Amino acid sequence: MGLEKVLNTIKSLKTTEKVFFISILFSSFVPVYLSFYLIPQTLFSMGVGITTLILIIIYFYYFASDESKWLQRETFMLILVFILIFHLPSLYFGSSRVSHSLPLKDNQIIKGDKFFLGWIFPLGQLSLYLDKNNTVGPHTKLGMIINSFLQIFYSLYYIVPYIFIYILCYANCIRETVYRYNNNGNKSKKYDKHWSELFFILSVYTITYSLVLTINTIIPASSPRLYIQNKYNHQLNLYGISKFFNKICKDNGSANSFPSGHVAETLSIAIALFGMKRYINGTIALIISFLITSATLVLRYHYFCDVLCGILISIFAFIIPYYIAFKKERFEFEKNDNLNINDDDLEKIPYMPALNGEDTEEDD
C-alpha cells in the first residue's frame, strides 16, 4: 500500500472514522510518553507500539479495501474490534507499572472526600459508615448478601463494556451479510449509519480508557481498602462465587484508584448508547453502571473523588466525538431516512387527482 493510497484513504474517511483513528493513537502514545518521561527505559512502550501498529495496519487495510469486497471489510472490522479489546487492557498493566513507583496521593484524595461528604460519613467514606452499621454492615447477614451481590457486578466491569461493543459490531456484520446475500451484494440503507454508531461508541470508550489511565499515572493512589484499612473494624465477608471474585480483584499493590475506571468506562458506554438513541440498551448499561459504581464505594475499592472524576471523564469523552462528528452524521442519516419514501408508503397517501393533472367531477 503506497503512501499516496494511504493519504487518499485518510481523506475519504468520515469524521467519526477520523475521530476513532485519533483516539487509537491517543490511547497508545500518551501512556507511552508518560512512561518514558516518568520511568526511562520501560519496556511497556514496546508492547503498546506493536499493538498499535497492528491496529493501524488493519484499520487502513479495512478502509482501503475494494468496496465490492464487503465481506472482507466486515471480517477485518471484527478483527479490529477484537484486537482493541486486548489493546486497551494492555495499557492498564503498563500504566500500573509506572504508578507503583510514584508517591501515592491518597491523603489528598481523602481530603477531597472529607470536603464533599465529611459531614455525612467518617472521612467522607461510605464504607466506613457501613462498617459500623449493625443493619447492613459487612458483619451482618444482610450486609454479606448485599456485598456478595455488588461484588459480582463489580467484577462484570472487566467484560461488560466489551460485550456491548462486540455485540454491536457482530450484529452489524451479521445484519449486513444477510442483507447483501439477499440483495445481490448491494449494501443496506442503514449500513453507513450502523458503522458510524460503532465508530462513535468505540471512540468514546477509547478516549475514556486513555484519560483514566493517563490520570492514574499522574495521580497514583491505592484505595480505601489499603490506605485506611486500619480504620475498618470488620472484614468483607462474602458468599459463594463472590468470594472467588473478591480474591481475584484483591491487589495489595494497586495504585490506580484515581479516577475510577469502573465508573468512567461503564458510564461512558451507557451515555454513548443514549446518544445513539438506543434507549433500551442504554438503560440496561446505565443500571449496570450504577450497580458497579455502588460496588466501588461499598466494597472499599474507590474513594468518592475517584467516582466523581470518573463521571466527569465519561461525560467529557462523550462530548468530544458526539459534537465533533456523530451528531452531524446522525442528523444527515435521519434526514435521508425521512426523505426516503418507498412504494408502500406512496400507496398510503390519499389520491388527489387534481394534483396529477386529471379533471375532477366538478370540472365536468
Place the predicted regions along the sequence by residue.
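Interfacial segments of alpha-helical transmembrane regions
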Residues: E74-L80, Y162-I218, Y227, A285
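Interfacial helix-loop-helix junctions of multi-pass membrane proteins
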Residues: S223, S257, I292-A317
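N-terminal transmembrane-helix/juxtamembrane module of multi-pass inner/ER membrane proteins
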Residues: L3-T51, K69-I163, N182, N186
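Intrinsically disordered, low-complexity cytosolic terminal tails
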Residues: D344-D364
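Aromatic-anchored segments of alpha-helical transmembrane domains
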Residues: F26-Y33, L84-S90, Y209-T214, S289-V298
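Aromatic-rich transmembrane-lumenal/periplasmic boundary elements in polytopic membrane proteins
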Residues: L88-G112, T206-Q235
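Membrane-interfacial alpha-helical segments at the cytosolic side of multi-pass membrane proteins
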Residues: I163-A171, V263-N281, A285, L312-P321
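Membrane-interfacial catalytic/cofactor-binding modules of polytopic membrane enzymes
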Residues: I215-M276
